[in-house]
């Protein structure tokens, strides 16, 4: 038995965002947002459609959206690549979801809270040890919570999860282990099989139940991710080398700053054959015009 990689956009959406995934998503959100407590009892998946088949692999991310029984909107995103301005994009998507709720003539009292749950396959907060981080509005000096604290950002940094299979204790542990390691498993672990929603998630992720076309599509998506990771790593290395060389001539600080710019442009150049201009701009933080100048 082999399982598809939940960290790819198609697999993540298939497992958590399809029309038959409600119970799975409820268990998953309770585990990651509410520390395993059964806070969520019901939800509606807002966009229960799978992403289109790969056409040039231009999509850089995909999210799942749901509305809880109390009206709260939840945006769930799996992010594999540490692209420039990613943190700003998370804030933008949460704010946009909050602001775009109102129709013409509706008052602010109609607004519902928004939770943005983001899983990253990289360390987003390098100097922070916590695996799961919750960010909300609070007073700067004494931490007093803002009364209408209706936007919450929740991050799960997968590299910080280091538990082995035999060390899994909580529902949170087991769901994170599933996301991080399902691709390398050959059977459903005994200590995870007793949770019905996890068992169903493994069933959806079973490669044997996919068509050859779906498997080919998933393989291309995984290769695309690996190519992007390689291109970004190479661009960073090339930019640093160029920056250090210039640092010896111009002064270290100025050279390193120039190196960062060179790294960004090197990353963009390495992506020219793989992505369109808009996707490269979203990945690197360059403007579309700057990307076009590199072609």
Predicted segments — roles?
Residues 1-295:
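Elongated, amphipathic alpha-helical interaction scaffolds
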